A protein has these predicted regions:
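Short, solvent-exposed turn/loop segments enriched in Gly/Ser/Thr/Pro and often Arg
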Residues: 39, 59-60, 85, 263-268, ...
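Short glycine-rich His-centered loop
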Residues: 3-31
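Radical SAM [4Fe-4S] cluster-binding motif and immediate context
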Residues: 180, 185-354, 359-361, 374
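Radical SAM enzyme core and accessory elements
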Residues: 2-3, 72-78, 410, 414-500
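Glycine-rich beta-alpha loop elements in corrinoid/cobalamin-binding modules
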Residues: 38-39, 45-175, 398
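Catalytic cores of alpha/beta
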Residues: 119-124, 303, 363-378
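Short helix-capping segments at alpha-helix termini
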Residues: 101-105, 127, 280-287, 380-384
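Flexible glycine/acidic-rich beta-alpha junction loops that bind and position SAM and/or redox cofactors
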Residues: 12-16, 270, 325, 329-330, ...
Length: 500
């Protein structure tokens, strides 16, 4: 049985659609292709169990739709698995209709956070064969392959339309598999080289791991805006030893120099201590640099000291806003005081903190949003952060924030195509142009003389220089992403596929 793990290319005037491994979605003018870790696990697990697997990321490979279709014509897969998010789901519905007309005997499955929230919607709007809910695409796709090839009963979390038109399902998805049972990702099968150039990697080549699924912060259900609260209801993590094994393999076999572990929040406590000590004991510290997502207030100063010794570099923090009322409404469970202290510790022990910030909350005034901009500038001027990502807050369908929008009448549109960060989707005291202006203002912190001077002084190697040059390119790309008039309405209809 041949199985294609697929990201069919979307040719858009908005830019390059980046949906793989992204909790948020955006079209980019200067794209960074992120390694789709869970689909890569799926490919590796299926291959390990004897299935013929192809990796067809048409977006990262920059294929045209016609080139992607020609490849699938040649490969003739029995099953195509497609990951989607809200802003791409309508396009993929159109694609699936055309794919089923062209390949009527190929089974097509769709997966992702959006279809997890609304599984019946894809069955109603496309001839897709199966909707996979939950985030464990690896275990779920193995279940589907075993069902199709051997008649084994499907695990919970599948939706499909029966021959009589009745929608059926196997019940609510259950996150009950042991992630330690998974094989290490087959990096060659999953074309690791497509994803080595990432704006966040200072030392190239770099790659991604994901030791946990997904975030251990789930108080009140977790952050209200996070789309992955729908796919990962509980926190699961592999052992520190398994990640150390993977890190060592990546360094020795592929010459990887930097890794970002994209677990929603990296494990803390004794797990972190064991991992850091293992990096030192295996003589991996600084031979390969480590990055991760972390929460403000989650660690103590001694933890950051240990991480510094273990070779951690890039640490991503979700600041989101500098207004406590917003942090409370988002259920972040953090404060500005924690942010300041955490960033000071991380920078003190040699790490490069990265901030994610969002603009356009329904309850924030212009003054509130400006307060966030000024707090971020203060952090950068103090030297406590090195990079940032500024975006427009999106109420992804199915999230707690989206339900709040529905209850309060905050939504400006329910056209999924427009949930792509090119415009504000929620009613707000701010105009759309003000949201974009504030977002651009955040990126202009990189142009301040003090920041530029500090970065110039810090350049000590070719890696430093190359990283700074890439940073300039990405900053100008982001300024273009949020330029006035950058929003476009729904993309043109997908071109009909012709047999060649």
């Amino acid at each position: 049985m041949r199985i294609s793990i697929s990201y069919p290319p979307i040719e858009s005037r908005k830019g390059v659609p980046l949906l793989a491994q992204n909790r948020q979605f955006q079209y980019f003018n200067e794209p960074t292709y992120i390694y789709p870790v869970i689909p890569a696990y799926a490919a590796s697990l299926l291959d390990d169990r004897g299935y013929d697997v192809t990796w067809d990321d048409g977006i990262a490979e920059r294929l045209s739709l016609k080139e992607y279709v020609a490849r699938q014509d040649f490969q003739s897969p029995d099953l195509i698995a497609i990951e989607t998010k809200a802003p791409t789901v309508k396009t993929y519905w159109r694609y699936i209709k055309q794919f089923k007309e062209r390949w009527p005997h190929t089974t097509i499955a769709i997966m992702g956070d959006h279809v997890t929230a609304f599984p019946e919607e894809s069955l109603e709007n496309s001839p897709v064969d199966y909707v996979i809910t939950g985030g464990d695409y690896d275990f779920q796709l193995l279940s589907l392959a075993e069902h199709l090839s051997k008649g084994v009963a499907l695990s919970p979390g599948f939706w499909w339309t029966d021959k009589d038109g009745t929608v059926k399902n196997t019940g609510v998805y259950q996150q009950n598999n042991d992630v330690n049972d998974l094989p290490l990702i087959d990096r060659d099968l999953t074309k690791w080289w497509l994803y080595v150039k990432n704006g966040n990697f200072k030392y190239e080549p770099g790659t991604y791991t994901m030791v946990g699924r997904d975030c251990w912060w789930r108080q009140g259900g977790g952050c209200t805006f996070c789309s992955w609260t729908m796919t990962y209801k509980k926190y699961q993590v592999r052992t520190p030893e398994s990640l150390l094994e993977e890190v060592e393999m990546l360094h020795k076999r592929y010459g990887i120099r930097e890794i970002f572990d994209d677990t929603g929040t990296f494990p803390a406590g004794n797990w972190l201590v064991q991992f850091c000590n293992g990096m030192v004991e295996r003589d991996l510290a600084f031979k390969i640099r480590i990055g991760c997502n972390m929460r403000f207030g989650a660690l103590k100063e001694e933890d950051y000291k240990l991480m510094g010794k273990a070779g951690f570099r890039f640490i991503l923090y979700g600041l989101e806003s500098a207004n406590q009322k917003t942090l409370d409404r988002l259920q972040k469970g953090t404060t500005n005081a924690q942010a300041w202290e955490t960033l000071r510790w991380a920078s003190k022990y040699g790490m490069d903190p990265h901030l994610t910030i969002m603009m356009g909350y329904p309850w924030e005034t212009y003054e509130d949003a400006r307060n966030t901009v000024e707090f971020a500038k203060k952090v950068f001027r103090a030297g406590y952060a090195e990079t940032l990502q500024a975006t427009i807050v999106m109420p992804y369908p199915g999230t707690m924030l989206w339900h709040q929008c529905k209850e309060n009448g905050w939504l400006l549109t329910e056209d999924y195509d427009r949930y792509d960060m090119r415009e504000a989707i929620m009613k707000s005291p701010l105009t759309n142009d003000q949201v974009k202006e504030l977002t651009q203002d955040l990126y202009r912190v990189f142009m301040e003389p003090r920041y530029v001077a500090r970065k110039l002084v810090s350049i000590r190697s070719r890696d430093d220089l190359a990283f700074a040059q890439r940073g300039v390119k990405y900053v100008y790309g982001h300024l273009k992403d949020f330029a006035k008039g950058s929003e476009l309405n729904s993309d043109e209809e997908a071109e009909p596929l012709q047999r060649g």
